[in-house]
Amino acid sequence: MKEKSKNAARTRREKENSEFYELAKLLPLPSAITSQLDKASIIRLTTSYLKMRVVFPEGLGEAWGHSSWTSPLDNVGRELGSHLLQTLDGFIFVVAPDGKIMYISETASVHLGLSQVELTGNSIYEYIHPADHDEMTAVLTAHQPYHSHFVQEYEIERSFFLRMKCVLAKRNAGLTCGGYKVIHCSGYLKIRQYSLDMSPFDGCYQNVGLVAVGHSLPPSAVTEIKLHSNMFMFRASLDMKLIFLDSRVAELTGYEPQDLIEKTLYHHVHGCDTFHLRCAHHLLLVKGQVTTKYYRFLAKHGGWVWVQSYATIVHNSRSSRPHCIVSVNYVLTDTEYKGLQLSLDQISASKPAFSYTSSSTPTMTDNRKGAKSRLSSSKSKSRTSPYPQYSGFHTERSESDHDSQWGGSPLTDTASPQLLDPADRPGSQHDASCAYRQFSDRSSLCYGFALDHSRLVEERHFHTQACEGGRCEAGRYFLGTPQAGREPWWGSRAALPLTKASPESREAYENSMPHIASVHRIHGRGHWDEDSVVSSPDPGSASESGDRYRTEQYQSSPHEPSKIETLIRATQQMIKEEENRLQLRKAPSDQLASINGAGKKHSLCFANYQQPPPTGEICHGSALANTSPCDHIQQREGKMLSPHENDYDNSPTALSRISSPNSDRISKSSLILAKDYLHSDISSHQTAGDHPTVSPNCFGSHRQYLDKHAYTLTGYALEHLYDSETIRNYSLGCNGSHFDVTSHLRMQPDPAQGHKGTSVIITNGS
């Protein structure tokens, strides 16, 4: 009975051994290795192999245990893979999320002295430095994926340095510190996603494992490394201050060794790469060896070269303390962007030749020359800006206004529309409308504030062949809804520049094109309607009561076609008529009265000033037409007006109908509003006979509203908006309402760019 049990146990062990032997033969290992394996190693390797099939389900051949016919090409592929591993100067390894090594190539024994069988199936934490355990855990940790759940599989790149155990002899191990060798690992973390059947838009992801290649860094004995033509070596202190440089640095970077000694490496590295270099420097001090990322080393004559460095800390042989840093640097490219100076140590070349500049790409200098040539050939054309700008906030003057036949506003910027040449005018050759360069859609000019969609659809204005676009657009531009039972009082200011001549000279006002600088509105007896006045200069802003617009009060302004060919002539005639009126207005200051009816004196609009330009932009001109002050007081304060005198079909006065009257025709009641944009002192603009403390305040109690609600509008050239014949016809159709044109002074805020200019205030008095 005892003998029988012994035989049964022996048979069982033999069967078990035979099964393990058959299992070992199925492993993708040479038979010489599998025949020497024990049972524990066979189980460890088998489990690792099964895990590998999960990572690479199609990369390990046929199904488990199935023998397949191998073609000669398959044998060539295996041999090629073996040769690639030998020439890789490294080893390949695959690590599971728990740290188990699922696979490692046999070349690991060359770098670490540890066999493939010994490492496979064991935890990688057993073979790395304890200080690197946390880093390895972070590498193997996968964060919440940001990819779409429809993506089944993706990779996350990983690059890190590990100190792995090395059991090689010192003569073959290279640099080791405490039995550990620095290995540069680079690879990717493989993530696989699965969708749930019950929730197709939700899913889960699986961290399959890490696939990486380990490279052994150059040994510390740098004298054994052959320096090729694209390599140079330097020795530096622990803070990267250069101590010694190879003479090849002069051929590769242009710097002589003595130019770089006693300077840190950071001093000659591109500013965008200093962070990566700092991280590599930190790893070097911690682990002893490092491979930097590609960084840009500045060349002496401008530009840079791309460099990658292999740095090693050399220890003192006696004290075993870190002594210095030795780095082998590989210059990967020629000098790029020659002539581009990024450091004071660089010497700019006599003729900068950027590598990215081609014959078809103009340089900045060529662009400037081309702009100057275009400016000299056509002074009347404006240089447009890619972004919409507003003349009320940009005080620079357009280059096209310096010598333009129309002059221009002192506040005209490069984006303000100017009169185009006939060849460049949009539409037909007879179309003299303004070119709205900064606006793609003209409807945004007509309806610049909050309107109902029905208003935009039902009463959208369409330009006809005989319609001047500039007149239509300016005439339909409004700032609010006139309220019933109150007197709408519309006004517009247009700035005219002063030429280099004296303000009193007649030539100072020749050929000047007015531009509307701002549009404002007053309702009632000198009271501002805050619900309808736009307070923000932003082009997309609207008043707070934008939802209270009543579309029935807004009808299209009456329009009568005029002769386009006589627009410029009419404008010049208007300016000449204005000059005649200005000559009549040159009277003693006692003939002027304040708007409030008090006996305050007002500074003359055109006087010789001997003081420097003011610091703020001032719009003065609180003047009356040639009517008595009592008439104005009766009309505005006494309310001696017909209740329907200003009710012109409850529609705002079209700016396209506003024009200067003849010199013999004076407005019956026009109150001119003045606005101090920057609250400048008015005393500097007074003559000797005026009181120094008097300021032309119009409705002083409401001056805060003037400062708050002034809205700046650019882009409407008045020569497109009227001719004298049209205004006469329109004024007769508006119950005999008259129009008045007066002038006031306009100063430039910037002393460097300051130049005097006049502006025309056009008001519709009622």
UniProtKB/Swiss-Prot annotation:
Segments forming domain Single-minded C-terminal: 336-766
Region (Disordered), start-end ranges: 353-431, 528-563
bHLH domain: residues covered: 1-53
Protein name: Single-minded homolog 1
Function recorded in the entry: Transcriptional factor that may have pleiotropic effects during embryogenesis and in the adult.
Compositional bias of kind Low complexity: 373-385
InterPro entries in the record: bHLH_dom, HLH_DNA-bd_sf, PAC, PAS, PAS-like_dom_sf, PAS_fold, PAS_fold_3, SIM_C
Cellular compartments annotated: Nucleus
SMART domains, A to Z: HLH (SM00353), PAC (SM00086), PAS (SM00091)
Species of origin: Pan paniscus (Pygmy chimpanzee)
Domain PAC: start-end pairs: 292-335
GO cellular component terms given for this protein: nucleus
Biological process annotations from GO: cell differentiation; nervous system development
Self-association state and partner proteins as the record states: Efficient DNA binding requires dimerization with another bHLH protein. Heterodimer; forms a heterodimer with ARNT, ARNT2.
Nuclear localization signal (motif): residue ranges: 368-387
Record GO terms (molecular function): DNA-binding transcription factor activity, RNA polymerase II-specific; protein heterodimerization activity; RNA polymerase II transcription regulatory region sequence-specific DNA binding
A Pfam family reported for this protein in Swiss-Prot or TrEMBL: PAS
Start-end of Polar residues biased regions: 353-365
Domain of life of the native organism: Eukaryota
Segments of skewed composition (Basic and acidic residues): 394-404
